[in-house]
């Protein structure tokens, strides 16, 4: 198994555990998708993917419909996606994806978390290169052979395909998302969920006390309403 498999195994059950937080993130994704490509999922592949993800976290259908309707209102502010980079204690690189309607607020908040937890907020590009930006798709196993599927999808950008208890996961570079999404839909394969992740190229092992220092910063960052995802180079 490759790095995507190990990364997924390490993060399982750790992030997106709070349902309310998941709903908030999906809501923001819906707004950004509708503002970008319109409210019709059939004509908006990004919105189609978000709706699939809403089902994966059991978000009520009426919540999704309400969010789409709200997003079509020209008075509804769009969210800007901003990437923050820095270091936690003990040399652990931190990469933070945010979606904010107030850039100044978000910058000030993220900086304060680093300062309070003995971290250092970095400049653009300071740690992003340490992570591979990937896309992923979860589909039902339905008796499919992951190895055969991987061979079939290599030409569309797939790099790693493996099975777990929840189905089959497909990993590919960030830029292959649209190509693989289209191919799966063309084949009539149900997409249970999809998304993007940043996988650290190298991880660092820490002591329990050092892990606690890093987790303190990560938890503080994750509590912020503007934060969508936090990635790091700490071994899990």
Swiss-Prot record:
Its main location: cytoplasm. The keyword Transcription regulation applies. InterPro entries: Integrase-like_N, TACO1_YebC-like_2nd/3rd_dom, TACO1_YebC_N, Transcrip_reg_TACO1-like, Transcrip_reg_TACO1-like_dom3, YebC-like. Pfam families: TACO1_YebC_N, Transcrip_reg. GO terms for biological process: regulation of DNA-templated transcription. Keywords: Cytoplasm, DNA-binding, Transcription, Transcription regulation. Belongs to the TACO1 family. This is Probable transcriptional regulatory protein FP0835.
């Amino acid at each position: 198994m490759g790095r995507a498999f190990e990364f997924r195994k390490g993060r399982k059950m750790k992030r997106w555990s709070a349902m309310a937080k998941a709903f908030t993130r999906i809501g923001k994704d819906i707004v950004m998708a509708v503002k970008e490509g319109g409210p019709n999922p059939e004509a908006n592949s990004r919105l189609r993917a978000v709706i699939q993800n809403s089902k994966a976290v059991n978000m009520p259908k009426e919540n999704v419909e309400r969010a789409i309707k709200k997003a079509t209102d020209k008075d509804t502010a769009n969210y800007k996606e901003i990437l923050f980079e820095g270091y936690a204690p003990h040399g652990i690189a931190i990469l933070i994806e945010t979606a904010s309607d107030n850039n100044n607020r978000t910058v000030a908040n993220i900086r304060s978390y680093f300062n309070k937890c003995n971290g250092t907020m970095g400049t653009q590009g300071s740690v992003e290169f340490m992570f591979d930006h990937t896309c992923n798709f979860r589909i039902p196993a339905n008796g499919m052979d992951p190895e055969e599927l991987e061979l079939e999808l290599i030409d569309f950008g797939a790099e790693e395909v493996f099975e777990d208890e929840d189905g089959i996961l497909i990993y590919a570079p960030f830029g292959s998302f649209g190509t693989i999404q289209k191919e799966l839909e063309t084949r009539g394969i149900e997409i249970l969920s999809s998304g993007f992740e940043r996988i650290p190229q190298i991880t660092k092992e820490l002591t329990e006390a050092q892990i606690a220092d890093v987790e303190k910063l990560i938890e503080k960052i994750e509590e912020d309403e503007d934060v969508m995802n936090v990635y790091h180079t700490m071994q899990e």
